């Protein structure tokens, strides 16, 4: 995979080049909401790391399918975070059956991060809420230059179960996005060859084979 270029104005991208490229979007919600139709109409495929647009996820997904453009989305492309997410999914289902456990999440990031809670914390809490039928308390901390720490706990009367992921740098997020770009390109090739493939996918489901 090679970087074909970058732009602060996506409409300035050469459209012939775009048709052979996977768009990797890590911007802000307002920008993605304004640009997703252009991305779907002009790029070979897309990897979306921007969060804060999930209220229109069905609308966006339908548009990408309409355009025949593969899209992979995730709130976090770190391999470790996606394994954490799968583990939390399983644990929350089992603890819901047992009963008597209260979930909580603490997320810590660098002082420059604008959103709180993080997109990853929102994704994790949505999963736990759905599985346990409870509201997950989420606490956010912004301090120093922390790349990111997510802690998910389940507090019971007799014990506590805790899952934690700590990113040492942002490299893991970038590497996961590159993996996703390869997946998106492969889906585009299969679709072009006439294979029946799902065009819109959650990175976690693809990566973990769910």
Where are these regions (language model features)?
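Residue-level detector of anion-binding/catalytic polar loops
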Residues: 22, 45, 70
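Short, well-ordered coil/turn residues at beta-beta hairpins
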Residues: 26, 49-50, 156
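Rossmann-fold NAD(P)-binding glycine/threonine-rich loop
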Residues: 30-41, 49-93
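N-terminal glycine-/serine-/threonine-rich beta1-alpha1-beta2 phosphate-ribose binding loop
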Residues: 1-41
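C-terminal substrate-binding/catalytic lobe of Rossmann-fold NAD(P)-dependent oxidoreductases
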Residues: 1-16, 99-210
């Amino acid at each position: 995979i090679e970087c074909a270029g970058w732009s602060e104005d996506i409409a300035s991208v050469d459209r012939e080049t775009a048709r052979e490229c996977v768009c990797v979007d890590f911007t802000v919600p307002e920008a993605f909401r304004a640009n997703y139709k252009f991305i779907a109409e002009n790029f070979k495929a897309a990897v979306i790391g921007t969060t804060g647009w999930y209220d229109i996820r069905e609308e966006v997904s339908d548009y990408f399918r309409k355009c025949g453009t593969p899209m992979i989305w995730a709130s976090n492309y770190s391999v470790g975070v996606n394994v954490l997410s799968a583990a939390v999914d399983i644990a929350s289902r089992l603890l819901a059956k047992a009963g008597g456990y209260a979930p909580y999440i603490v997320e810590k990031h660098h002082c420059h991060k604008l959103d709180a809670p993080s997109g990853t914390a929102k994704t994790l809490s949505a999963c736990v809420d759905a599985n346990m039928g409870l509201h997950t308390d989420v606490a956010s901390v912004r301090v120093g230059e922390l790349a990111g720490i997510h802690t998910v706990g389940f507090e019971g009367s007799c014990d506590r179960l805790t899952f934690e992921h700590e990113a040492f740098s942002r490299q893991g997020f970038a590497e996961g996005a590159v993996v996703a770009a390869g997946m998106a390109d492969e889906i585009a090739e299969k679709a072009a060859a006439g294979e029946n493939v799902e065009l819109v996918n959650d990175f976690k489901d693809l990566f973990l084979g769910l």
